[in-house]
């Protein structure tokens, strides 16, 4: 393998000079800097400067690097362990275990993190719904098995909590394989998630990859590809349906932006890298379903300053089948999950996919919530007394629907001391249909807040001293 030496170090960016006339390492190749007999760091070739100089990005801290240090070409891109043995383990961007478990032997199957997306004739689409057990998602923006989902929201509105609940519900109910990729998020959250999954017994069906906030931008740029490579193996070789969770895709963009100027690129809109769309496309086009197996991807997307026109979230929108938008005003009202039922969308909300009854109930819910939003302006200026009887009924039912869209989470039980609930789609449809048809008009609004199926509402109302008068509600309570 060819050898070079360091000629310049600028933060995470390292320039390496190789002898002119010899074969230069390819773009995306991994280079190894030998710091001492038992210490080395990995660089990745990003671009060629001319005169045998390659500009590289470090996957680890560049502390201790100096000019003149020897650099070896590994001859290939960064490669990470793949296969069933990765389940139950935690890795860094280089595929090295960071959970204190045994190292993988040199002859263990590995795969390079840079690959081409599957060809067009290999792709397939699914029309099967992935049940999540979260009412607002299953009813209004159902997720497709093998689809791509984005959880959009500003800081502190609950993106990571929803991702953790989805991992819990899907692992418990669907018995599937998951890959969780932490991209530039808090180390504490990754630590909590690891021990939570260990305690609930789902860790042995999950591979975890972390490149957290404190790591160099090179690691945060590439860690999403590491997680995706592990997921691709289960799809392409094992022929399985895999769930890929990425938290947070914005940090992937942010890391690229951090090194873009150091690489000599002129910034684009809002200071982002000019290659933003290309980088996002290279990642997203690989996250897809083929005739061999599927990858269902659920990605948290941080929205800077709650501005959805920011180039980072706006670029992500184009690749998604469903979007779950989290709204700060709902957090302020104490409605969790704080999913905006009118702004969230899904291509699967189609009578041919979800069935006519589900579609009808969902559109009726959206209609009544939209009408309530329009009436709020009148209410804020003139008060409820100026509304007609029909409008008052719409407001009353809309508020019950809004509260019933909230739900207690299993992963939040440790904070709230209230048990979580998993609600099957059939139960969700039944509950909202009863509210829409007026069977629960005499129950207090608070009975609908933070509950699971509609039976929980009736039990909560009883505890509040209210017995339903509607025959259908009474019959359900007696069951």
Swiss-Prot record:
<dbReference type="InterPro" id="IPR020003">
    <property type="entry name" value="ATPase_a/bsu_AS"/>
</dbReference>
<keyword id="KW-0813">Transport</keyword>
<dbReference type="InterPro" id="IPR000194">
    <property type="entry name" value="ATPase_F1/V1/A1_a/bsu_nucl-bd"/>
</dbReference>
<dbReference type="GO" id="GO:0016887">
    <property type="term" value="F:ATP hydrolysis activity"/>
</dbReference>
<comment type="subunit">
    <text>F-type ATPases have 2 components, CF(1) - the catalytic core - and CF(0) - the membrane proton channel. CF(1) has five subunits: alpha(3), beta(3), gamma(1), delta(1), epsilon(1). CF(0) has three main subunits: a(1), b(2) and c(9-12). The alpha and beta chains form an alternating ring which encloses part of the gamma chain. CF(1) is attached to CF(0) by a central stalk formed by the gamma and epsilon chains, while a peripheral stalk is formed by the delta and b chains.</text>
</comment>
<keyword id="KW-0375">Hydrogen ion transport</keyword>
<keyword id="KW-1003">Cell membrane</keyword>
<dbReference type="InterPro" id="IPR036121">
    <property type="entry name" value="ATPase_F1/V1/A1_a/bsu_N_sf"/>
</dbReference>
<comment type="similarity">
    <text>Belongs to the ATPase alpha/beta chains family.</text>
</comment>
<keyword id="KW-0472">Membrane</keyword>
<keyword id="KW-0547">Nucleotide-binding</keyword>
<dbReference type="Pfam" id="PF00006">
    <property type="entry name" value="ATP-synt_ab"/>
</dbReference>
<dbReference type="GO" id="GO:0005524">
    <property type="term" value="F:ATP binding"/>
</dbReference>
<dbReference type="InterPro" id="IPR005722">
    <property type="entry name" value="ATP_synth_F1_bsu"/>
</dbReference>
<keyword id="KW-0406">Ion transport</keyword>
<protein>
    <recommendedName>
        <fullName>ATP synthase subunit beta</fullName>
        <ecNumber>7.1.2.2</ecNumber>
    </recommendedName>
</protein>
<dbReference type="InterPro" id="IPR050053">
    <property type="entry name" value="ATPase_alpha/beta_chains"/>
</dbReference>
<dbReference type="InterPro" id="IPR024034">
    <property type="entry name" value="ATPase_F1/V1_b/a_C"/>
</dbReference>
<dbReference type="Pfam" id="PF22919">
    <property type="entry name" value="ATP-synt_VA_C"/>
</dbReference>
<dbReference type="GO" id="GO:0046933">
    <property type="term" value="F:proton-transporting ATP synthase activity, rotational mechanism"/>
</dbReference>
<dbReference type="InterPro" id="IPR004100">
    <property type="entry name" value="ATPase_F1/V1/A1_a/bsu_N"/>
</dbReference>
<dbReference type="Pfam" id="PF02874">
    <property type="entry name" value="ATP-synt_ab_N"/>
</dbReference>
<comment type="function">
    <text>Produces ATP from ADP in the presence of a proton gradient across the membrane. The catalytic sites are hosted primarily by the beta subunits.</text>
</comment>
<feature type="binding site">
    <location>
        <begin position="153"/>
        <end position="160"/>
    </location>
    <ligand>
        <name>ATP</name>
    </ligand>
</feature>
<dbReference type="InterPro" id="IPR003593">
    <property type="entry name" value="AAA+_ATPase"/>
</dbReference>
<keyword id="KW-0139">CF(1)</keyword>
<dbReference type="InterPro" id="IPR055190">
    <property type="entry name" value="ATP-synt_VA_C"/>
</dbReference>
<dbReference type="GO" id="GO:0005886">
    <property type="term" value="C:plasma membrane"/>
</dbReference>
<dbReference type="GO" id="GO:0045259">
    <property type="term" value="C:proton-transporting ATP synthase complex"/>
</dbReference>
<dbReference type="InterPro" id="IPR027417">
    <property type="entry name" value="P-loop_NTPase"/>
</dbReference>
<keyword id="KW-0066">ATP synthesis</keyword>
<keyword id="KW-0067">ATP-binding</keyword>
<keyword id="KW-1278">Translocase</keyword>
């Amino acid at each position: 393998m060819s050898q070079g030496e360091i000629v310049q170090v600028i933060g995470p960016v390292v320039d390496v000079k190789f002898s002119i006339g010899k074969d230069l390492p390819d773009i995306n190749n991994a280079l190894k800097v030998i710091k001492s007999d038992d210490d080395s760091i990995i660089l990745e070739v990003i671009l060629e400067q001319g005169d045998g100089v390659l500009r590289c990005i470090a996957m680890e801290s560049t502390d201790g690097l100096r000019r003149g240090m020897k650099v070896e070409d590994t001859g290939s891109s960064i490669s990470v362990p793949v296969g069933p043995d990765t389940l139950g383990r935690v890795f860094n961007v280089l595929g090295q275990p960071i959970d204190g478990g045994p190292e993988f032997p040199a002859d263990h199957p590995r795969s390079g993190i840079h690959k081409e997306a599957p060809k067009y004739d290999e792709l397939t689409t699914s029309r099967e719904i992935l049940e999540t057990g979260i009412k607002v998602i299953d009813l209004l923006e159902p997720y497709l098995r093998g689809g791509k989902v984005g959880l959009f929201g500003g800081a502190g509105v609950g993106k990571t909590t929803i991702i953790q609940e989805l991992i819990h519900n899907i692992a418990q109910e669907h018995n599937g394989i998951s890959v969780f990729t932490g991209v530039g998020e808090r180390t504490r959250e990754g630590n909590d998630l690891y021990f939570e999954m260990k305690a609930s017994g789902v860790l042995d069906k999950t591979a975890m990859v972390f490149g957290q906030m404190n790591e160099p931008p090179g690691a945060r740029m590439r860690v999403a590809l590491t997680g995706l490579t592990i997921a691709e193996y289960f799809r392409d070789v094992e022929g399985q349906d895999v769930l890929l969770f990425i938290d947070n895709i914005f940090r992937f963009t942010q890391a690229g932006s951090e090194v873009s100027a150091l690489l000599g690129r002129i910034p684009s809109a809002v200071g982002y890298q000019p290659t933003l769309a290309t980088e996002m496309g290279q990642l997203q086009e690989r996250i897809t379903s083929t005739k061999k197996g599927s990858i269902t991807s659920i990605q948290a997307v941080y929205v800077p300053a709650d501005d959805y026109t920011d180039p980072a979230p706006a670029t992500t929108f184009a690749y998604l089948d469903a979007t779950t938008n989290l709204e700060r005003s709902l957090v302020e009202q104490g409605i969790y999950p704080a999913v905006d039922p009118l702004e969230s969308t899904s291509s699967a909300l189609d009578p041919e996919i979800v069935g006519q009854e589900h579609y009808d109930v969902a559109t009726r819910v959206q209609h009544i919530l939209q009408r309530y939003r329009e009436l709020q302006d009148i209410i804020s200026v003139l008060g409820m007394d100026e509304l007609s009887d029909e409008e008052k009924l719409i407001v009353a039912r809309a508020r019950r629907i809004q509260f019933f869209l909230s739900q207690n989470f299993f992963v939040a039980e440790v904070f709230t001391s209230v048990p979580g609930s998993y609600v099957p789609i059939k139960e969700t449809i039944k509950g909202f249909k009863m509210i829409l048809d007026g069977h629960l008009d005499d129950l207090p609004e608070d009975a609908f807040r933070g509950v699971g199926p509609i039976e929980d509402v009736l039990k909560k109302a009883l505890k509040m001293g209210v017995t339903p008068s509607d025959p259908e509600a009474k019959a359900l309570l007696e069951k």
